[in-house]
Amino acid sequence: PGSGLRAQGEVPLASAEAQGQVAAYGDVMPSHSMPIEDYALLGDTGTAALVGRGGSIDWLCLPRFDSPACFAALLGSRENGRWLLGPVGRAVSTRRYLGDSFVLQTTHETSTGVVQITDFMPIGDGRADLVRMIEGVSGTVRIRHEWVVRFGYGKVRPWVSRRADTPQIGSGELISAIAGPDMLVLRGSRLPHAVDGRHEDEFDVAAGEHLTFSTTWFKSHHAVPPPIDVDDEVEQTVGRWEVWARSCDHSGPYREAVVRSLLVLRVLTHGGTGGIVAAPTTSLPEQFGGPRNWDYRFCWLRDASLTLEALLRSGYHEETVLWRNWLLRAVAGDPEDMQIMYAVDGGRELPERELSHLDGYAGSRPVRIGNAAVDQRQTDVMGEIMAALDLAREQGLEDTPESWSLQRALVANLARHWNEPDNGLWEIRGPLRHFTHSRVMVWVALDRAINAIERHGLKGPLERWRALRSTVRAEVMDRGYNVERGCFTQHYDTTEVDASLLLLPSVGFIADDDPRFLGTIRAVEQDLLRNGLVMRYRTQAGVDGLPGDEHPFLACSFWLVTAYAGAGRLEEAHALMHRLVALANDVGLLSEEYDPVGSRMVGNFPQAFSHLALIRAALALHEADSAHSEDTPS
């Protein structure tokens, strides 16, 4: 069904084999040997799962993005929980999302036949189901089925039993797994058998045969939910996603990548609360084998603000109310108590701890849950919030008296503390600094608050904020710009640069073609390019107080595209954009970082920040191309 990205991920089988997309998937193999880019995302706007190319679901948190995982093989082994449904032995596997959806169809070709497996999570029904459908296409294929449930991030073995389904709601048998408050049930055309604490099965699928399996989560003290109508749900799920995707009004050359990125933002946004998680995973490393492993399953105010902007600029006006309301609820209360991130439901307690029972992806330890950055001071966040709400006002999303009162209080608090050092955009765990990007975003917060008064008739201390805006700008120009290097600097006490400086024109602080910004682009190219991609900053400078290194940051590389476009370097902008879009995996997903030497994805996956930056870069290129066409004589 559908159109748009219908063929996304399809590769001729011979080509796939040449690219090495062949593996023995039924073997007992450590999940960390699978590259990050070999995973695809399933989601229902409540939580998400990662399924590998060979059919193993190695990561799933239920019932919410930030709940403990019940399948955690991604960060350990199959003994930490997974759900495998795939061919035994070698297979050439290709996959695609059906239309503009998150219904994944994988085709496995073996020496004896071809099967298709369709995986999806129904949306819009308020349940937590994961459905897998297998269909024989030709010949006969031997299939391996494993259902290994381990609650508590792969540590807790549940009490598992096989019993008759509740007569009133289903027929046949089901397998239930229960531990404390959580319960899963597996239904299917052919249930696996208990083997040493796991459930396993092998069977043949011939051409024309259809089998269906579903896993459902519910609270253990509740009644077992009824089975779903799989055929109806798959059709409705594809339809709902495609209706949402059609609202995108972007018409530039990168529309396909923009639509997929918007879909990623939507699936990572909780359908009930409106909070967007930075990624559905924790502890996928920034350096394989290293300690830079963080939990991204929470809602950063920055990401929420930038998502609001991306949606508004892509034609999603009605939908932005959900995001705005989460943002306003999250920051409600005493401005002194505002955090940089919250739980999906707006909760404030996100204590960071390490899970010693998990070996980590590719041996990268520690595995962390929670995030200590919750207690950091990141002054730039207020600028992102006010910029997003200003854009919403400009596009007709009016403030309520309560929302403007809250914004006034937040800006007033910022005015009292703006010149204090902070941890910055990159959540530096080293000493607090006066980061230049943070100071610029103070200016942005004041500028957008002033705009609300001048253009929209809202009430506030206009002259006081104007004076402070001028003071902040003068300080940034004096202390955040290095005359000798001819560029802005990472913070006031260094000559180093970081990639956040590429954002200065996009927030209106300086013109795209200002010599001071053009010098900053040159400094970023000189200091931060690694194999043509952009690092966040030089870790060798020791500013972040952490051991080890990291790889180029995909969002930063998209920011360079935006900077090139604004500076009129359109050929270079398009060349870099084409390269970056091609770094997405076969179903259009991006991680946090990319290793250009090893040609592999790095970091939590998929990463909202990377997809946000892609959207911004595509829009900037479209605007620059249009302006260039208008200026070019016919």
Show where each model-derived region lies.
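Short linear motifs in low-complexity or flexible loops
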Residues: 12-18
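Acidic, mature catalytic/reactive cores of soluble proteins
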Residues: 20-634
